[in-house]
Amino acid sequence: EMSRGLGDVYKRQYNSMPVQNWGPSIEGLDMSNIVTYVRPKTEMRGKWSEVPDDIKNTFERLGIPKAERASLAGVGAQYDSEVVYHNVKAEVAAQGVVYTDIESALNGPYAEMVRTHFMKLVPPTDHKFAALHGAVWSGGSFVYVPAGVSVEIPLQSYFRLNAPGAGQFEHTLIIVDKGAYLHFIEGCSAPKYNVANLHAGCVEIYVGENARVRYSTIENWSKNMYNLNTKRAKVEKGGTIEWVSGSFGSHTSCLYPMSILAGEGARMEFTGITFAGAGQDLDTGAKVVHAAPNTSSHITTKSIARDGGVSNFRSSVTVLPNATGSKSAVSCESLMLDDRSRSDTIPEMDIRCDAVDVGHEAKIGRISEEAVFYLMSRGLSEEDARALIVGGFAEPIAKELPVEYAVEMNNLIHLEMKGSIG
């Protein structure tokens, strides 16, 4: 079966490749204790009512039924290693939109499309954990939007790890054809266990000519999670990829969605926020390759660190020799809430073309005690005053999300400020 037939080859690649010598340490991740596959307690279900109560309760806490009532178009819920609930509303399916688990796609009429695109943007040779993903992947989603179709309501997918010492290696493959539009939302969470967990999923997005894709993520993994996810998009002529990313949980994160602007006039927008608390080392950012003329990219991030947390921003902008007339702007603002926390900005630029406009801006600061004093003079407690300031700092990110997800993000920020997320 596709990469599974190459599993031994990919395992050898994984074993032979070195661990990265930059960024956060992953020495605490003992791969000998990671279970690469955990079968859920239920077979595939098409209706919410058919899902067993214990799994249903897990997803209710994630808000899936509520989200469906809000008319979100599709739900794919990954509980440990397989999708156990997947549904696409009839009106979306009637547009010719395909949203299914990737194993079903491999056995259906779109099998050849999956095989043609699977792990082509993120080959197993890309890095050590891409090789591991290629060897042991299971579960995930396949989305295909036909040419000219605009999916007006978001598709969404949830990933939840429930087994201690488990690894989750889901693969999301999204293909949006010429002139089409899609908004895909990914939510991630996991309860806390004493054993380290690993998330090494993969997202591949193909944006057709003059198409537009928005990919939004709210990640709230538990504080024992190593989040080593890989996300990548290829954008054709006149197409647009928009990333909206919120990283709150995990013990360690290395997350840098990459966009390859392959066609003339292709665009990339990245908007992200990272919140690191005690014991967290979150290394996040974005990468872009300008591979065609008149392409543009705009990266805007906010980083927050408290209680000794580390929140680093890492960016990479590459402009190839043929990408004349291209523009790239990178902006990072960091807010440290105490003198024990750390926030660094690590930009990398590889410009191989003269006729381009590239810029980078970074700001690092602390909460103004004068602002806290003013808000307290208006009746707020010190805790509420600081939370309000941090919420205002994050507001440009929140406004890019659908309202229910913006509310969730603001709640996460308030919980993080109180140190009450496990």
Per-range role (PLM):
Residues 19-21, 66, 99, 151, ...:
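Residue-level detector of short coil/turn "hinge" positions at structural boundaries
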Residues 85-87, 91-380, 394-422:
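Conserved beta-strand/loop scaffold segments within soluble protein domains that form the structured core
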Residues 1-6, 10:
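Single conserved hydrophobic/aromatic residue that forms the stacking wall/gate
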Residues 17-95:
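Glycine-rich, N-terminal phosphate-binding loop and its surrounding beta-alpha-beta segment
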Residues 7, 27, 48-52, 136, ...:
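Generic structural signal for well-ordered secondary structure
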